[in-house]
């Protein structure tokens, strides 16, 4: 598999594969986000997911992929503090604000800063047409957040800090996307970085969750946390793994923009699975997000 990934890197086939991977990551990330903002405390849910990630990824890292060498260990370890800050930001935002408001803002902040980061780190550039696509996509995402903000009835007393936390966490999305792209490109075998990333960058939140668990009086059933953790870990492998491979194969900025169509998938999940009302305005905003992504993809 790694030989095939390396063989199509920087080719038209690689571009197509990167597009498919980024869209797959978008769908899976929407599902992943809804799991963390479920009925279980977001700190516990993230801890359960990360615990499962360590247990599932460790055998792969130890026995199925080449071990990191020299500077590759530094690349893997460098992801830990960045992703820890991101996960803390997400948990803080989710514990204070509604998912339908927090999630679009976090994802909406990422694309423009990632495109700038990709320019500074990798020398990537966007055409004027692609920037117009980014503008359309971000307008749709933030429009969706504003619409949800006006209609929600829960968590309104803590909404302002939730919005600030969501905006800051969105900036961290750009930081970790750029860093992960740099790291996976600096590792000869991309699956070496992926396997060890899911081990090393997942050891922190289980500790935080365990400390929180000890202080709780109304604890959720352990079996429920285990099911959530395993399900979330498998989805995370597909989501984060797909977008990282996409940034290895093609432009980081384009992969980041396509991934943010996850807000469309999140709204569709709410409509089809949770039976939430969509309405013409949300349909128009989701269409704008999709159109923006198409413009970015075709305008390069």
Model-identified regions with their sequence ranges:
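Hydrophobic transmembrane alpha-helices of multi-pass small-molecule transport proteins
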Residues: 1-3, 57, 115-119, 129-148, ...
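Membrane-interface interhelical linkers
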Residues: 1-81, 87-99, 146-167, 199-231, ...
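Hydrophobic residues within membrane-embedded alpha-helical segments of Major Facilitator Superfamily
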Residues: 21, 28, 52, 82-85, ...
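Structural signature of transmembrane alpha-helices in multi-pass secondary transporters
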Residues: 53, 91, 103-110, 169, ...
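Hydrophobic alpha-helical transmembrane segments
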Residues: 59-65, 118-123, 183-184, 271, ...
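Specific alpha-helical transmembrane segments that line the substrate/conduction pathway
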Residues: 82-83, 95-144, 192-200, 252-272
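Selected transmembrane alpha-helices and immediately adjacent juxtamembrane segments
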Residues: 159-185, 189-192
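Alpha-helical transmembrane segments and their membrane-interface junctions
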Residues: 178, 242-259
